[in-house]
């Protein structure tokens, strides 16, 4: 007997449609101004570091697609109790990463690339485990792409060099992250 569910079909369609709409105008419609500014700075950092506009656009687009898809899964109550526990673990680890990133920026010369790399890698691994039963291999690739890109030790070192070319971008990102933490969004 064929199992058909209009709810499942609607969710798949929603994920598919939203994944194709990860343009800047759509992002601004779906997220708040602070998050949009952070994404813009992440794009600038990626572009400056890689020297490749296309790669910078791709990594931010992948980030948006992943966030949207996980949001759709959450909104449609697709996660089991075990997965919701993983989601809480991810949220805690992400919060820890955000607070560490802010601290490293606020107190110059405290940056430790091994710590940041480990936090980002842990976030990636928890997120992959969370969505392993729900997303495609292509989405797993997007998750790896985003986290591997931003956990690159050279990128992190350039980013956290006080007075370096990426320092103003980092300052804007940390100001935005601070605002999101204060608002209880992170």
From Swiss-Prot:
Q: Which InterPro entries match?
A: TNFAIP8-like, TNFAIP8_sf
Q: Which GO terms describe its cellular component?
A: cytoplasm
> Which domain of life, per UniProt?
Eukaryota
Biological process per Gene Ontology, one example term: regulation of apoptotic process
The answer to whether the entry has keyword ATP-binding is no
Keyword Cell inner membrane among UniProt keywords: no
UniProt keyword list: Immunity, Innate immunity
Q: Relay the domain remarks.
A: The central region was initially thought to constitute a DED (death effector) domain. However, 3D-structure data reveal a previously uncharacterized fold that is different from the predicted fold of a DED (death effector) domain. It consists of a large, hydrophobic central cavity that is poised for cofactor binding.
Please state which protein family the record places this protein in.
Belongs to the TNFAIP8 family. TNFAIP8L2 subfamily.
Q: What does this protein do?
A: Acts as a negative regulator of innate and adaptive immunity by maintaining immune homeostasis. Negative regulator of Toll-like receptor and T-cell receptor function. Prevents hyperresponsiveness of the immune system and maintains immune homeostasis. Inhibits jun/ap1 and NF-kappa-B activation. Promotes Fas-induced apoptosis.
This protein is called Tumor necrosis factor alpha-induced protein 8-like protein 2
